[in-house]
A protein has these predicted regions:
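Charged, compositionally biased non-catalytic regions
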Residues: 59, 64-93, 215, 219
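Conserved small-residue-rich
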Residues: 120-127, 147, 216-231, 271, ...
Length: 380
């Protein structure tokens, strides 16, 4: 159709904007939604101790989150729908339909792959319908440090678009601190930088030459696709980007299988260890560039058996089930599943039994034993 030919990137991969209907006027609420909560993931609920974690409560600008009696509730009427709680929670207690970590990465990856520049902005800053390379969010603080890290390892053409004074007058009073901290952390881990654009007149909406040119180097297209690309050069480029996004998604999904081969996914009491989406993104980036591991500064617990009474408080608090205690009382921490929240150390009643120390992040680089075996056999 004419629509497919005029905008193949959106047609093949889903619109980069929330509402592809160009006739509909800009409505900020179309880009926002109230998160839902899963109390089974909440560290505070699992431990029964308020001191275990307060990240969502601390970041919420409307004080609309209530954690009480093993439940996590959001006051829908008070919620600003900024999404900061989603980014702040290390265990994915909060979720939204349109802004999961992997969806946010994919959205940025599509734009950054096709355009000379990708801009991440908010509804208040943009105040209009976004172009194909503009990622419009409720608040830029929705992107966690882990998502920024994954973006910066793959792309060097991503900027934040926020005109001066936008954050100063925003009701999301905690958003500016949230995104500045997240970006600063990711920049420290990668050595890369996020651009900043404050003038809407300087926004660049040009496709990359490589994107336009990719019709000539795409060997994966069938004959019918080649006929279409002859009249629409960017269609092949859109398919190449779709292939790249799908390949990235497959590599992240494969991590679960690789970890099962290396250390197993189930604990002694048959609970399944859980990889959060943020951790998958970080591990995916490190699989691609393991040399970055020493620069990713995280803290993880170490166990001192001489001070431990095997009470199980730490294991019961860890909702990703990264901690296991076997029938002999030996405690094991599966580092890929640890989200570095520190709750286990906080709830431990025995001082020194668990201590947060700098993590050896090379443990997040998972060996692919099947691939290694294939390479070994091919070398024979």
């Amino acid at each position: 159709s004419l629509q497919v030919l005029s905008n193949p990137l959106d047609a093949l991969m889903g619109s980069l904007s929330i509402d592809p209907n160009t006739d509909k006027p800009f409505e900020p609420m179309d880009y926002k939604e109230i998160p839902w909560s899963n109390a089974n993931r909440c560290l505070r609920c699992a431990s029964g101790k308020a001191e275990a974690c307060s990240r969502c409560l601390d970041v919420c600008p409307a004080n609309c989150i209530d954690i009480h009696n093993q439940s996590v509730r959001i006051d829908d009427e008070a919620c600003l729908q900024c999404g900061l709680c989603v980014a702040a929670c290390p265990t994915e207690t909060f979720n939204t339909r349109r802004h999961t970590s992997r969806m946010l990465y994919d959205q940025v990856a599509r734009a950054a792959s096709a355009y000379e520049q990708c801009y991440i902005t908010c509804t208040r800053a943009l105040a209009r319908k976004p172009e194909g390379n503009e990622i419009c969010l409720p608040c830029v603080g929705m992107l966690s440090a882990d998502i920024w890290f994954s973006i910066l390892t793959d792309f060097d053409n991503v900027s934040v678009y926020l005109p001066l004074g936008v954050c100063d007058r925003c009701r999301t009073t905690t958003g500016e601190e949230a995104y500045t901290q997240a970006i600063a952390t990711a920049e420290e881990w990668t050595g890369a930088t996020v651009g900043l654009e404050v003038d809407g007149n300087n926004l660049n909406h040009n496709f990359t030459r490589a994107y336009i040119r990719s019709q000539f180097i795409s060997n994966a297209m069938n004959g019918a696709e080649r006929l279409v690309s002859a009249s629409s050069p960017v269609l092949a480029g859109a398919k190449a980007i779709a292939d790249r996004i799908n390949s990235h998604a497959r590599s992240l999904d494969k991590l679960q299988t690789q970890l099962d081969d290396v250390m197993g996914l189930r604990t002694t009491d048959m609970r399944q260890s859980m990889l959060t989406q943020d951790r998958r993104l970080v591990m995916g980036a490190l699989q691609h560039d393991p040399d970055l591991a020493p620069y990713v500064k995280l803290a993880a617990p170490i166990w001192d058996s001489s001070k431990c009474t095997v009470c199980g408080d730490c294991k019961n608090t860890c909702t990703t089930h990264a901690i296991d205690i076997d029938e002999r009382g030996k405690l094991t921490i599966k580092m890929p599943f640890c989200v570095n929240c520190g709750a286990c150390e906080i709830v431990c009643p025995e001082p020194g039994a668990l201590t947060m120390v700098p993590m050896n992040t090379s443990e997040l680089v998972v060996r692919d034993r099947k691939a290694e075996e294939t390479e070994r056999l091919e070398a024979l």
